[in-house]
């Protein structure tokens, strides 16, 4: 809702007890790429609330569902703030209880920097367009993941906003299985490409020579 639309609703909300306007943050993605690596967020489920030992989540909260969003949920979510407000008989805010003595400001989530090279990631996705497969590029010296491509993939923007449920169901029913992260969940024989690494290991350990065993 726009600020103007919210203003109209707020003027009439006192007539509808139990209804209120709640702000929430919606993820924005700078690139239409790396959907499998980044993951997505969605409304917390009853099962996730039961598993929440801290009691942090309530109905309507959003939580990381897949990928980095899920793995680093506790770091990205921040901490909730608390405001105790006084209202009149019509539900209109009159001020803060005890002048805000028991209020607590919210704490924003931490920033997370990935090792993904977005140019390399987008190149990999272009190379696998209309194909089935995966590409993983790893920096040998550090072990950093430079790209993590799974194809078919999907636009991460499909998993935000009010159409998330509809879009997720559409992707789930797709016979090409775009939700499957083939780079991590697929099992494929390495084939002849593995012989190069195996041969170098043998040479390094002195097991064989360049001419043969």
Task: Show where each model-derived region lies.
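Short active-site loop at a secondary-structure junction
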Residues: 113, 168, 172-194, 211-213
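Extended, hydrophobic alpha-helical segments in both membrane/secreted and soluble proteins
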Residues: 145, 193-203
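Periplasmic/cell-envelope proteins involved in peptidoglycan metabolism and beta-lactam response
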Residues: 1-165, 187, 204-212
């Amino acid at each position: 809702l726009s600020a103007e639309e919210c203003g109209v609703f707020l003027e009439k909300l006192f007539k509808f007890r139990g209804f209120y306007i709640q702000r929430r943050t919606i993820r924005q993605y700078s690139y239409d790429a790396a959907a499998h690596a980044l993951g997505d967020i969605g409304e917390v489920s009853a099962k996730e609330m039961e598993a929440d030992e801290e009691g942090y989540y309530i109905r309507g909260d959003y939580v990381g569902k897949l990928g980095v969003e899920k793995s680093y949920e506790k770091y990205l979510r921040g901490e909730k703030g608390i405001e105790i407000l006084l209202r009149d008989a019509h539900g209109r805010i009159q001020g803060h209880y005890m002048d805000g003595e028991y209020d607590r400001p919210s704490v924003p989530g931490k920033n997370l920097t990935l090792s993904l090279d977005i140019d390399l990631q987008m190149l990999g996705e272009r190379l696998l367009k209309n194909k089935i497969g995966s590409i993983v590029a790893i920096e040998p010296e550090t072990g950093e993941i430079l790209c993590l491509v799974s194809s078919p993939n999907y636009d991460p923007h499909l998993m935000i906003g009010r159409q998330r449920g509809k879009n997720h169901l559409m992707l789930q029913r797709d016979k090409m299985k775009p939700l499957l992260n083939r780079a991590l969940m697929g099992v494929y024989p390495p084939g002849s490409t593995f012989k190069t690494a195996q041969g170098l290991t043998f040479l390094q350990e002195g097991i064989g020579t360049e001419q043969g065993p």
